[in-house]
């Protein structure tokens, strides 16, 4: 159980084929949320219910080409929408500008529901403000932090502590 060594909330972003075969293992490992890709799941509602059966949060990941409207039928069952603002697979990619409109659409779909709106891909000091302004309340940043000389400073700036 990972909770024995970390108090940080953990989201397992399953960018894999057949995530249903791995949900139970991640739940047993002690993650707080499991996020699965919309595009990989024919039976998305069933998969979300499988995640929720472990009393953990469920998130849905949308790749750049996937429309926000596609998750409308399951919006009341999820705890997080993760907008991929790059094509998944490798770090260091440039932020896809059309993601801003997608974030705004997702924020509107969420309405007053208690759902996180996360964005992953190309998040750096040049993109974080516009992503937050569009409605995101959780940012995932890899390369901007890893490749920086002063990681703590970059993290603080991404958090808005300038």
What are the language-model segments listed below?
Residues 1-12, 50-59, 99-121, 157-162:
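Alpha-helix-loop-beta-strand connector modules within alpha/beta enzyme cores
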Residues 26, 81, 106, 120, ...:
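Conserved, mostly hydrophobic/aromatic
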Residues 34-42, 82-93, 134-154:
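Glycine-rich phosphate-binding active-site loops on the catalytic face of alpha/beta enzymes
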Residues 23, 45-48, 68-71, 100-107, ...:
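Generic structural signal for well-ordered alpha-helices
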Residues 20-28, 66-77, 123-139:
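Catalytic cores of alpha/beta
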Residues 1-50:
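N-terminal active-site wall of soluble small-molecule enzyme domains
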Residues 10-14, 34-36, 58-62, 81-86, ...:
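Hydrophobic faces of well-ordered beta-strands that scaffold small-molecule active sites
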Residues 64, 72-104, 108-111, 117, ...:
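Glycine/Thr-rich beta-alpha phosphate-binding loop at enzyme active sites
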């Amino acid at each position: 159980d990972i909770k024995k060594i970390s108090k940080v909330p953990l989201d397992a972003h399953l960018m894999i084929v057949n995530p249903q075969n791995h949900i139970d293992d991640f739940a047993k490992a002690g993650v707080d949320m499991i996020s699965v890709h919309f595009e990989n799941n024919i039976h998305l509602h069933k998969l979300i219910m499988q995640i929720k059966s472990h009393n953990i949060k469920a998130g849905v990941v949308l790749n750049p080409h996937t429309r926000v409207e596609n998750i409308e039928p399951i919006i009341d069952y999820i705890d997080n929408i993760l907008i991929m603002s790059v094509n998944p697979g490798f770090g260091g990619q440039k932020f896809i500008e059309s993601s801003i409109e997608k974030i705004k659409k997702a924020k509107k779909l969420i309405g007053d529901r208690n759902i996180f709106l996360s964005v992953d891909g190309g998040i750096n000091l040049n993109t974080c403000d516009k992503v937050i302004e569009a409605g995101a309340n959780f940012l995932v940043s890899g390369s901007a932090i890893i490749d920086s000389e002063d990681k703590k400073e970059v993290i603080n700036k991404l958090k808005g502590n300038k």
